[in-house]
Amino acid sequence: MPKQVIIPPGTTTPIAPFVPGTLADGVVYVSGTLPFDKQNNVVHIGDPKAQTRHVLETIKSVIETAGGSMADVTFNSIFITDWTNYAAINEVYAEFFPGDKPARFCIQCGLVKPDALVEIASVAHIGAPT
């Protein structure tokens, strides 16, 4: 089955050669998502909760555009710049995954823009198209 490019309406033009998501064989692959506005500027500078919420809302829009929901997420890759933000990021993360949690990992690293505190990439299994 060929892949389908997923670009939600009003999505920011990426700053590198990639798309927000792809769908193949009922699996949505969401690119690493940063807390960017439509001009690729970091939003909510210094606020890990607001940045995490922005990132997860963006991921949600990609998955919903593909026909799924956040309940379909099976794996997240989380990148944070400072472990002191870990609890705040997890607090917001739990709001988006209230039931069965997806598998994930979380590492501390530098991100592409210094004011970004969190980046998340996701995988969601939405099943065969109807």
Curated annotation (Swiss-Prot):
User: Domain of life here?
Assistant: Bacteria
Catalytic activity from the UniProt record: (Z)-3-aminoacrylate + H2O + H(+) = 3-oxopropanoate + NH4(+)
Entry's EC annotation: 3.5.-.-
Per its UniProt record, what Pfam families does this chain match?
Answer: Ribonuc_L-PSP
| Disulfide-linked positions | none
Has keyword Hydrolase?
yes
Q: What class of enzyme is it?
A: hydrolase
Protease recorded as keyword: no
Keywords of the record, alphabetical order, are: Hydrolase
Example GO molecular function:
deaminase activity
GO CC annotation terms, alphabetical? cytosol
Cite the InterPro entries for this sequence. RidA_CS, RutC, RutC-like_sf, YjgF/YER057c/UK114
Q: Name one GO biological process term.
A: uracil catabolic process
Please give the function described in this protein's UniProt entry: Involved in pyrimidine catabolism. Catalyzes the deamination of 3-aminoacrylate to malonic semialdehyde, a reaction that can also occur spontaneously. RutC may facilitate the reaction and modulate the metabolic fitness, rather than catalyzing essential functions.
Family to which this protein belongs: Belongs to the RutC family.
| HAMAP family xref list | RutC (MF_00831)
Instruction: Write down what this protein is called.
Output: 3-aminoacrylate deaminase RutC
Gene name of the record = rutC
